[in-house]
Amino acid sequence: MLDALDEHDYLISTTGLISREVFAQGDRTRNFYMLGSMGLASALALGVALLRPNARVVVLEGDGSAMMALGTLPLVAAERPANLTHVVLDNEAYESTGAQPSISDRVDLGSIGEASGYMRVNRVSSVDGMTAALPAGSPAGPALVVAKVVLDPLLRVPPRVSLTPQQIKARFQAALAENTVAVNEA
């Protein structure tokens, strides 16, 4: 999924293992790693999308994080940021805190996105499906991608993000201050 990002895209990733994996896969100044703030990634992404309407903004969070702040989904839909793609990695667990089961096996997050008013909702369960759901450029959003995933228990746990929250904030603010490329120019 990270390969689908353009150098001008902003990525906000939720706390825990998702931010750790994003950081390990390739740190960028336009990545904002939420450290210790579960459930707030989508709200931050909405703010970035509204601030920078000509840049694609992707938020990456788990099912536990998304369910902690379900009220953000209708807020995102009401604001209608065409440049926002909201990706939920749904493994039906709070993986970062010990893999306790979540309730997403009984809650259809895609249907909640549709009922909230997201312009596009995709449900995927493969890498090919994820690639198709994240097209180059950014068709009218907001878009929600709910990806059912299964974690391999033998995979290594990525190292912690080595930046301090202050460093993450400062460099992301600097990236926001840079000129951005329009979504459809890429």
How would you label these PLM feature ranges?
Residues 8-28:
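Acidic-glycine-rich active-site phosphate/pyrophosphate-binding loop
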Residues 139-186:
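Glycine/aspartate-rich loop-and-adjacent alpha/beta segment that forms the canonical ThDP
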